[in-house]
Amino acid sequence: VCTHMDNDHICGLIQVLKGTNFNFIENVWYNGFLQIVNSRFYSQKENIFTEKDNKILDEIISQGMLLDVDQEVGINEGMSLGVLIEERRIPLNSAARGQAICSELVKNKYEIAPSIFITILGPSKDNIIELEEYWKKEMVSRNYMFRVSDKRRLTEAFEYQIERIKAIYANECFKISENEDLMKYIGGLTERDESIVNRSSISFILEYNDKKFLF
């Protein structure tokens, strides 16, 4: 289960899928471009705006993933998680028949192994729609006209763009020297935690026998 598009989650999984020992993965739960964005935004006929749209996607992809300064794992070849899942032909979101993992589509306990169950708490369909709307707004601000149907390039650009949207909510790091600084820092954390990217994350309870674990 990849709960959300964050570099500290995605980059490690990308390294696994880029290797040769990934056959132990039978299924992936992950809400990517095809699960979040309605097909009408990538199924339009090409027209005079297509070349311009491709340049916008190229710009986003060329910037790649935002990485932390001290992060050792990175994307060497600009390959996104969604693209790798498709290329490796790994079943995606089987519990939701390939659609987005959300509380409305996976309503009951889902048995992933003998005596091991997952109960989806979130996101909701509304959270998914809200993230889609935010992404569309960001793309429109770039004068994107939604005239590209290349799912691979769209998937890659989408993941990179979402990471940057999340960064908008991140609180700037600063040294806490006084109580007032601490309150500002806490306030910043609250704003970050309420971002649409975090609200659209997959949250769930993992159950095994009489034990429950919250993720």
For the regions a protein language model found, what residue spans apply to each?
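Metallo-beta-lactamase
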Residues: 1-8
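Residue-level marker for buried hydrophobic side chains located in beta-strands
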Residues: 1, 213-215
